[in-house]
Structures are given as C-alpha cells and as structure tokens.
Amino acid sequence: MNIIQSFTHRLSDLIKQYPLAMSFIFISTAFIPWIQDESISRDMIVVLLLPIYFSTVLLLNKRKYANGLAIAYAILITLAFYFAERPIYDNDAYWGLLLIHFVLFVTYPLAKENRLFVYNTVSRLTQLALAIVLAGIICICAVLVLNSIEYLFNINLLSYRIVPKTLLFIMCFFTPVFFLIFEQRLAQNFQGERFHYVIELIVNFIFSPVVILYTLIVYLYLAKILFYFELPKGGVAYIIMPYIALGLCCQGLRLLLIDAKWTGFYRVFAYLSIAPLVLLWVGIHTRITTYGLTEIRVMLVVLASMMTLFILFSMTQRLQQYRLFSLTACLLLFISTILTSPYYLAQQHQLARFERLLSELNILDEQQQISATIFDSQFAKQLSSEQVEKYKQLEEIIGGYIKTNPVAVAKYGQEKLNYLHGFYYNQIIYNTPYQDEEASITFYAYDTRRQDNYTIDIAPYQTLHLINGYVNSGDPNERETQTQETSTLFQRQFDLIDKHNKYSFDEHYFVEVFKAAGLDIHQKYSQDTLLPLAKELTQVPTREGGLLIFRDMDFKYEVHGDIKGYVYQGGYIEFYLAP
C-alpha cells in the first residue's frame, strides 16, 4: 500500500507541475480500450500522436503562451492526420514528424556549449531508456498476473483483444509518467552531475579503438581501389556510415570524460573522414545506378547528407555546435518526409528507370507505347540472357512503383503493365523450353486476386472434420516420382487415414478438371491459363462420397519419356466434409 500511496502522491505532484502533459497522457490512453480492428487506422491516431503531444509540451515549457500553442498544435496535427488519405501508421509525414520531435526532444534545450549539449542529450536518452524499461517490466508483470488469474480461476483473460490493449495502455501511460519523474529528479540534482567510470571505459578503450581500426581498414580499402583502378562496391555505404556515426558519437561523448584519450586522433577525425565520405557517396551512387532509388535508399541519402554536413561543420570552430547538428537533421527530415516523401521520390526515379529499360529492350512502338509484340507466345523464347535480366528488373520495378503511379498507368495502360509485371515468371521462367523437366505451380483455394465467390454446397454432407495437415503424393523421403510408378501416373489412388476417418481419392479427378476447362493435363500452359482451375482442383471428391477441402495444392510438370504432364505433388488439407 505504501508503494501505491507513494506513486499516487508522485502522480499528484506531476499533475501540478506538468498539467498539460499529464492531460495529454490521460486523454490519449483513454482511447485505447475503444480501439476496434475495423477502424484501427482512425482509432489509433490520438494514441500514436501521444509522443508528439508530449514532446511539444516539454519543448514549449516555460515559454509564453506555451499551453495555448501546444493545444492548438495538437488539434492541428490531429485533424491533418485524421483527414489524410493514407493511414497514420503508413504515412511518411507522421514518421518524419515523429523523428523531428524525437531529435528536438532528446537535444532540448539546444545548449550552445557543446559539453552541456551532450550532457543534456545523454541524460534525456538515459531517462527515456529507463522509462521504457520500467514500463516493459510492468508489462511483463501484468501478463504474469493475467496468466495466473486465467490458470487459477479458469477465466479467459489472455484474449487477443485484452492483452494487446493492456500492454499498449501500460507502455503509453507509464513511459511518459516515469520520464517526468526522472525529469523532476534531474532538475533537483542538476549540479551533482557525475558520469560513471563505465562510460569512460567504453569510449576510451572500446569505441575509440574500433573507430581507429575502421579508419585504417577504410584507407587500406581506398589504397586497393586506387591500385587496381576499380570502383568501390555499392555495399560500402553500409560500412562507412556506421563508422562515421560511431566516430561522431565518440567525439561528442569525450566532452563528458574527465580523462579523455586519443585526443590527437579526434583532433583530425573530421579531415580523416573526407576520404571515407567520398567512398560513401560513390557507393551510394553505384547502388542507386545499379538498383534504382527505393525508400530505404532515399533515407540513406538523407543520413549521408546529415553526416557530410556534420563533418563539414566540425572543421570550423564557429560551426561546431551540436545544436546546429540537431537543427540541420530536423530540416533534412522535414524536407524528405513532410515536404515530399521517400516513396514519391523513389517512384519518380523508378519511373525514369522503367522507361529507360523499355527503350533498351526495344519494346516501345513509334507512339512510345508498349508494343503488342510482347503478347506473342514465342516472344519470350527469343530473348538473350542479358534481356532476360532486364525483364527481371522490370518485374521488381513494376510491382513496387509503376502500377501505383497514375502517370505510368495513364501513359502505358493498366492491362499492359499487369502483363509486364508477370512477364518474367509467367513467360520467361515458366514457359522457356529449358524448364520442361521441372515446372511447379501451386493452386490456392483462397486467392484475393480472384473475384469469384467461394461457396461450397454442404447439403450432401453430414459432418465437417477439421484436418489441418499436409499430405504428399508418396513417401516423404521420395520426392521424385519413381520410374516404376510412371506407368500409373494420372491413374493413381491416394488413401488417407486420420484418427476419425479413412478416405481416398483418385488422381484421375485432376485430369477431368483440366478436360472440363478445355485443357489437356499432358500439355504445358502458362500460369495465367492454369490458375483459374484452383477452385475445382482444391475441392476433391472422395470415393466414400465425401469432399476434401485443400488450402493449397502443388503440381509439377514432369516428363518421363512419352508420359508427361502436371503431376500431383501434395497439398494442405483444411477440412473434410463426410457423407
């Protein structure tokens, strides 16, 4: 009880000292119990915006008209995301705004003196980390309590609705509350700052030697490039960036140390970083030129720009202010995520790459439209290996960026884009003569791409049995059809037994499904031709008069001398309707 009373008293003090921040916490967490699955994108807005509300109040603390500005800002961004076209959790502007607030929040109050700036940042990050850890511990305790109650009293508490909402409430309520408690204590003991010896040990004897070793490795790699006169690998960007980030981090943390080592190295670190930065940008350029711009690579460019500016600022005493680093990072994030978006930038770049590939493949007609020659059944078999690789690139581009680009759809047509999207697998990989020996296809009973109404007439059956199990066409250790079995292909009988039923079905049923669709199971077809058979193939009648309902079913086009065709490999049975 003393703990509860102490926490209640502490909560009362927080409400008096931070009334608006606590109000936002109460309001946002009050929405959590009412979140519904079907309207989660709307119901979660106030909850997901809590970090922004909370940080805004603390950033404006002790400013004139702080409460009014914070409330107005909160209402404005809430309405903006409520009426936005994309759900808040899928909106680049939300994540960009969240990152900007995070940077400003942990670097508050943007102290001009670098040592104080680093101290404030480390202190806030430590407070935030401890608050999250404590809230996480409460989450674990809550789950243990709910589990105990459920086990002892046979009360179903651990439902998929209760537990997630409970944990979300705990994290959203206790994390900011614990942070405010730490903030109170820090304000009361500011003059007594002292950092543990462990930080000095980590910076002086672990991180700094790693940075120096990385510097040596990077310069050796640079010497290798110059010696062999070759371009750096595209992946070098993912090596250089952590190295420079760690170096900048150590350079800042050294300001907090009483006995900082490696002073000479860090005095010239900014100048030593110039060559790695050049490698970084060459690597990024190589990566983008080869694979195109994606959302991740847009953010890679943003991060590389930040680090480049930070290094340049570090070269002059006047600009080497960490608050300037913080504001620069916020500006770049604002430009890349709110004024525009990584997806939009990637989409525009990939459209240019798409059109360049179309020209290189020579499939544009005189009107600069996609030529009808791609629909020729023999077209794919005439392609060179270099052209095949370019069609593979088209496959990757179209699905992620082109089919959702209204400019591309208006210019080239949805039908041709859809056809090109599946061209690599359907027409090249699947239909090439080199694949006749082994071509697999999976039929899915429930496919969102099909518009048909999936219904089953259950009148002829008495009971439904849940199976949920995978069965294959033979011995699981014998994946290939044995030579002695080839004479009976398409005439086999499969006997299945479980603890409730015994049932069997004939392979000849699949032959009849093909025939009913005007197809020959012994001939090879494109996937687009075969996939409409999925509904009939996954509803298999048994000899006992029942019906097996498959979730998915695998076939492979096999060739055994004169005997060839789509051979049943196995499938996942969900239900059995017994007569």
Swiss-Prot record:
- What residue ranges are annotated as transmembrane? 13-35, 39-61, 66-83, 93-110, 130-152, 162-181, 201-223, 238-257, 264-286, 296-315, 324-346
A cellular-component GO term for this protein: plasma membrane
* Keywords (A to Z) from UniProt: Cell membrane, Membrane, Transmembrane, Transmembrane helix
Location of the protein in the cell = Cell membrane
Give the way it sits in the membrane. Answer: Multi-pass membrane protein
Its main subcellular localisation, reduced to a broad class, is membrane
What InterPro entries does the record tag this protein with?
A: DUF4153
**Domain of life, per lineage:** Bacteria
| Identification of the protein by name | Uncharacterized protein PM1469
